[in-house]
C-alpha cells in the first residue's frame, strides 16, 4: 500500500490476519498506517511489518462509546523485523468495551519511532515489547500499560520525550537513554513505573554538561526513575553518542542518596549522582592518527637531514652537481599506535662553491597504521628547498624550508 491521498488517509483498516509481509507508506500528513475500529475489528500481523507515515500514526485503534472491542497485534515470527515510523495511538476519549494495541519488536533492525499515546490502563491498553537490541526512539511523552525492555533493547527518551509512564515493567539487560542536567538537580527526563518484575536495566545519559563543557562537581542528585513496586534495579552504563567523550553515569537507589540539603531519597527512587567522562574510541583513533602522521613527517625530516649530512663530506672540487634519490622504509610505534611506512625521495644538488651547496627535493610516501581501536592509511607528498654552508673548524649551517600535505583515512 502506498497512499499519497488526503490528510487523514488510512493505509489498512478492518479485521486483518496477515501471515506474510506488510508494507504501508502513507505520504499524506497525519495519516494512519494500520487501524482497528471498535466495531469488532481484530487484526493480527505475524510477518514483516514496515509502516511509514508523514507525521502520523503508525498503529491506531479507534473506539466508539457502546461499541464492540477492537485489537491490533503485531507479533512477528522469528527473524522478521518490525519498523514503525509514527505514533502508536488510541483515538478516543470514550469508554469502550476494550481497545488493545500489542506490538513486539524482536530483531536488531526493528524500531518504533514515535510516541505511545492514549492508553489509560482500563479500556485502552497498549503493550510494547522490545527485545534483542530493537529500539524505541520515543518522539514524545508516552504512556504504556505493559512494557518489556530486554536483551540490549534501547528505549531512547532523548528523541523528543520528557516523560514515560508505565503500569507494568519487565525485562533485563535493556537500556534507557535519557536527557539530563545533573548540575540543575531538577531538569531531565523522567520515568514513572507502577509495577515491575525483578531485573536489571541500564541507564545511559546525555547530560547538558557535555555541551557546556562545565564539569559537574559537588554533592549532586537528579531524580530519573520512580518504581513504586521497588522491584526493578537500574545501573549506569557508558554511552558513546559521538563527539569527544564516553559518558558513564553513576545511578544510585534513593535509599543510598543523601541530598545537598541533608535529606535522603526513598527506596522507590533512582538518582543520577555522578558523571564520568573519558575520551571515547573515536577520539582516541583521531589522536593516534595525529601522532602517527607527525611521526611519519619526522621520519621524512630525518631522512632529509641525513642527505645534508652527506653533503658535508662532499668534495665540491671533485663531485659535481647532480640528482640524488633515496628510499626509506620501516616501522615505528608510539603510545596507542604502530605503523609501517615506505618513503621515496628525489632531489637535486647545486654546488655553488667549495663551501656552499643548495638544492631541492620532493618526497612521496605512505604508511599503514594500526591503533588499539582502529586502523588508518597515510599518504604524504612534500617539497623542500635547502642549503648548507661549511665553515672553518668543521662548523656548518643547514637551512631547510619544507612544505607538504597529508591525506589520512
Please annotate each region the language model reported.
Residues 3-11, 15, 31-36, 58-61, ...:
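Structural detector of coil-to-beta-strand junctions
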Residues 14, 20-22, 47, 70, ...:
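One face of beta-strands
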Residues 21, 35, 48, 71, ...:
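Extracellular Ser/Thr- and Pro-rich, acidic-biased low-complexity repeat/linker "stalks"
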Residues 24-26:
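Conserved "HGTGT" condensation-loop signature of ketosynthase/thiolase-family condensing enzymes
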Residues 39, 44, 53, 58, ...:
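Extracellular beta-solenoid/beta-roll
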Residues 62, 118, 371-375:
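Alpha-helix capping and helix-loop boundary segments enriched in small/acidic/polar residues
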Residues 278-409:
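Outer membrane beta-barrel translocator domains of Type V secretion systems
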Amino acid at each position: 500500500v502506498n497512499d499519497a491521498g488526503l490528510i487523514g488517509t488510512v493505509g489498512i483498516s478492518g479485521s486483518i490476519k496477515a501471515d506474510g509481509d506488510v508494507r504501508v507508506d502513507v505520504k499524506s500528513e497525519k495519516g494512519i498506517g494500520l487501524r482497528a475500529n471498535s466495531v469488532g475489528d481484530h487484526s493480527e500481523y505475524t510477518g514483516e511489518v514496515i509502516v511509514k507515515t508523514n507525521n502520523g500514526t503508525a498503529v491506531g485503534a479507534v473506539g466508539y462509546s457502546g461499541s464492540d472491542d477492537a485489537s491490533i497485534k503485531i507479533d512477528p515470527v522469528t527473524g522478521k523485523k518490525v519498523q514503525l515510523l509514527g505514533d502508536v495511538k488510541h483515538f478516543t476519549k470514550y469508554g469502550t468495551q476494550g481497545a488493545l494495541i500489542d506490538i513486539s519488536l524482536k530483531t536488531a533492525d526493528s524500531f518504533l519511532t514515535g510516541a505511545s499515546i492514549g492508553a489509560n490502563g482500563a479500556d485502552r491498553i497498549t503493550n510494547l515489547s522490545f527485545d534483542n537490541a530493537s529500539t524505541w526512539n520515543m518522539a514524545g511523552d508516552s504512556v504504556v500499560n505493559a512494557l518489556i525492555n530486554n536483551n540490549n533493547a534501547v528505549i531512547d527518551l532523548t528523541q523528543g520525550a520528557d516523560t514515560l509512564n508505565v503500569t507494568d515493567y519487565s525485562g533485563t539487560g535493556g537500556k534507557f537513554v535519557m536527557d539530563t542536567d545533573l548540575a540543575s538537580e531538577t531538569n531531565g527526563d523522567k520515568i514513572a513505573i507502577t509495577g515491575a518484575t525483578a531485573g536489571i536495566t541500564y541507564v545511559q545519559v546525555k547530560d547538558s554538561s557535555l555541551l557546556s563543557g562545565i564539569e559537574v562537581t559537588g554533592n549532586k542528585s537528579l531524580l530519573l526513575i520512580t518504581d513504586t513496586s521497588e522491584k526493578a534495579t537500574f545501573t549506569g552504563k557508558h554511552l558513546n553518542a559521538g563527539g569527544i567523550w564516553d559518558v558513564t553515569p553513576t545511578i544510585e537507589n534513593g535509599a543510598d542518596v543523601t541530598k545537598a540539603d541533608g535529606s535522603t531519597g526513598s527506596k522507590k527512587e533512582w538518582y543520577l549522582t555522578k558523571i564520568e567522562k573519558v575520551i571515547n574510541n573515536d577520539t582516541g583513533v583521531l589522536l593516534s592518527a595525529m601522532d602517527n602522521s607527525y611521526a611519519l613527517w619526522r621520519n621524512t625530516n630525518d631522512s632529509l637531514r641525513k642527505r645534508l649530512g652527506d653533503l658535508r663530506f662532499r668534495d665540491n672540487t671533485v663531485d659535481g652537481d647532480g640528482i640524488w634519490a633515496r628510499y626509506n622504509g620501516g616501522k615505528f610505534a608510539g603510545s596507542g599506535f604502530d605503523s609501517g611506512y615506505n618513503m621515496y625521495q628525489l632531489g637535486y644538488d647545486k654546488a655553488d662553491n667549495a663551501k656552499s651547496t643548495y638544492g631541492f627535493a620532493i618526497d612521496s610516501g605512505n604508511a599503514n597504521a594500526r591503533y588499539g581501536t582502529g586502523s588508518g592509511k597515510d599518504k604524504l607528498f612534500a617539497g623542500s628547498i635547502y642549503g648548507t654552508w661549511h665553515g672553518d673548524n668543521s662548523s656548518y649551517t643547514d637551512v631547510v624550508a619544507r612544505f607538504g600535505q597529508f591525506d589520512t583515512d
